[in-house]
């Protein structure tokens, strides 16, 4: 019984710990003349970033429900290992590579960085 209680308490404690990763959330308004192929290339390139920058753990781009200002059609979420990794990503070769694809078709964006 003591072992079962210890296991339950350990599992509960592990679940209660807040994550230390950082979510970098980008809400994008594409330029009016951006083609579907260009948008797909930018989104696909975002998915390649974890292989180009080790501090990025995951990337999400599939919108299930999206409530935003008029013209904003895309959310891109990048999960970074830490705030330090997010800061290191800024101006990195990986970010510059992605910006070469993303920035020419981006009209504007709003970014939020969130952690616990």
Regions found by a protein language model. Name each.
Residues 3-13:
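Sec-dependent N-terminal signal peptides
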Residues 5, 17-20, 60-69, 99-116:
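Glycine-rich beta-strand-turn "strand-cap" elements at beta-sheet edges
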Residues 21-29, 61-90:
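Short, well-ordered beta-strand segments in beta-rich or mixed alpha/beta enzyme
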Residues 24-57:
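N-terminal targeting signals for Sec/Tat export/insertion, comprising classic cleavable signal peptides
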Residues 51-56, 79-113:
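An amphipathic, aromatic/His-enriched active-site/gating alpha helix that lines ligand/cofactor pockets
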């Amino acid at each position: 019984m003591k072992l079962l209680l210890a296991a339950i308490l350990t599992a509960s404690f592990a679940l209660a710990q807040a994550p230390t990763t950082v979510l970098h959330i980008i809400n994008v308004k594409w330029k009016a003349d951006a083609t579907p192929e260009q948008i797909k290339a930018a989104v696909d390139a975002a998915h390649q970033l974890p292989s180009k920058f080790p501090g990025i753990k995951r990337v999400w781009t599939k919108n299930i429900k999206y409530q935003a200002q008029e013209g904003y059609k895309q959310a891109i979420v990048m999960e970074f290992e830490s705030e330090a990794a997010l800061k290191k990503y800024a101006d990195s070769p990986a970010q510059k590579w992605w910006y070469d694809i993303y920035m020419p078709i981006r009209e504007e964006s709003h970014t939020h960085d969130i952690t616990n």
